[in-house]
């Protein structure tokens, strides 16, 4: 196996916006898990919670590792700041971490190096808050018809979410494409879903000599 030099790192974790914070939290053995909030679930977590496994359409735990109080700064990229500010947090996290890794490596402002750099992004292709909202009108319409028939009232309406940006609908390749464009990376870029083994696949399948390896787990 060929040798790979790690020349830049960054990270964004629950309770840790930098690698230094992450390391200190590990040393101090901090438990940075917490209970889900309405912001995480889109509704009160109590609606979905049921104490006990096996209950249909319910979860038996709302505890997890949630990123809190992260503010994405959309400036300093090769794409419009207003456009980036409207992207799903999945994309914004990827942009932030990639930019910080480039800065840590010393190549953020090196245009030639970035043109010869690619990106391999590990991404679990689960629905995001934004992608769900794009389809909410379909769900609402279906439920609406059933409720109208059940109650015998054709005037009942169930509102859907406000329209989301269409770019937020694609979950597999779009994050890597957006990061590559925003940071002007000129070589091959792609995302793959291999859960915890994603980083191993990325190292094995790296398309260019200089590449990012990002693992994004939600």
Where are the model-predicted features located?
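ACP-dependent fatty acid/polyketide chain-elongation machinery
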Residues: 1-84, 91, 95, 131-149
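Carboxylate/His-rich catalytic cores and anion/metal-binding grooves
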Residues: 119-122, 127-153, 157, 161
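Flexible, low-complexity linker/loop segments at domain and module junctions
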Residues: 1-7, 109-116, 213
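Beta-strand segments within the central parallel beta-sheet cores of soluble alpha/beta enzyme folds
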Residues: 111-121, 160-162, 189-194, 216-218
């Amino acid at each position: 196996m060929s040798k790979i030099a790690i020349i830049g790192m960054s990270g964004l974790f629950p309770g840790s916006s930098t690698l230094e914070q992450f390391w200190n939290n590990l040393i101090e053995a901090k438990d940075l898990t917490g209970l889900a909030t309405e912001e995480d679930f889109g509704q009160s977590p109590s609606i979905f919670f049921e104490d006990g496994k096996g209950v249909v359409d319910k979860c038996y735990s709302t505890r997890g590792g949630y990123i809190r109080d992260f503010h994405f700064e959309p400036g300093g990229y090769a794409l419009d700041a207003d456009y980036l500010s409207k992207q799903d947090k999945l994309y914004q996290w990827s942009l932030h971490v990639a930019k910080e890794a480039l800065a840590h490596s010393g190549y953020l402002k090196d245009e030639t190096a970035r043109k010869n750099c690619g990106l391999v992004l590990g991404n679990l292709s689960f629905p995001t808050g934004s992608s769900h909202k794009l389809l909410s009108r379909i769900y609402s319409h279906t439920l609406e018809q059933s409720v109208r028939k059940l109650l015998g009232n054709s005037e009942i309406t169930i509102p859907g979410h406000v329209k989301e940006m269409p770019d937020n609908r694609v979950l597999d390749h779009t994050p890597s494409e957006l990061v590559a464009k925003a940071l002007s990376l000129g070589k091959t870029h792609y995302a793959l879903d291999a859960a915890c083994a994603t980083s191993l696949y990325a190292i094995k399948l790296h398309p260019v000599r200089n590449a990012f390896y990002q693992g994004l787990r939600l």
